[in-house]
Amino acid sequence: NISEKNHERCGEVAKALLGKNGYGLMFSLNLYSKDQNLATQCFEINEIYQDLGLPRSQKYKIRVSPAFPIVGDQENITLPIRDYPKVGRIMVDLLKEYPQLCFRFDCSFPPCFLDEIQEDEYPLVERIFYHGNQPVPNIQDWETSDLYLGCADDSPMDIDPQGDCFNCFPFHNLKLGNITDFKQINDLSIKKMHTKFLGHAFSAEPNEPCKSCPHYMVRCSSGCFAYNFA
């Protein structure tokens, strides 16, 4: 927020919305930099839940999204993939500090976020969700399970301010249409990327550090494909 007054107002609005609609509403944070004050952001969100009396036995989720490149004309600040482990280290520390906190990724979960995790912290990863609602399995099970944490079809539909629809927000050049093109919300929700998008996405070679990463093409598809086109 651009001012302390606006920041305070956002907190007031959040409390009012949660008070009316229940704990199911989700805060959303973009991950722009390893130096952003993620700890303060999570502290303030946790305080709101505690002030509203969230039962100790109940968890809450914060939606997080790394700031990806946008393919095409738009430029935006992105979180470099080389910084994913540093940001992941901060997130693991926050999971330890706030036992009710969970993190939710809409689409892929790049496993390099956990490159700096310690073995005694492995159980914490089950409070990280990917593809919307899938809990990340304990790291000890990764080698023996059929696990894919990368880009997936059926991801949530993104709609930009102009009403243009995307299965993958960074690929603005591959929009599915405009909300005015769909007669019903069900028609919009079942529109999928399928092979056209994935064939295009895999056409670009991965960049470093993904190209040399041991996770690549084992359980990860190089984070967000948009990095390979940027």
Regions found by a protein language model. Give the residues of each.
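C-terminal accessory region of radical SAM enzymes
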Residues: 85-140, 164-220
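Radical SAM/AdoMet-radical enzyme domain recognition
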Residues: 1-86
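Short, small/polar residue-rich loop motifs at catalytic or cofactor-binding pockets
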Residues: 149-154
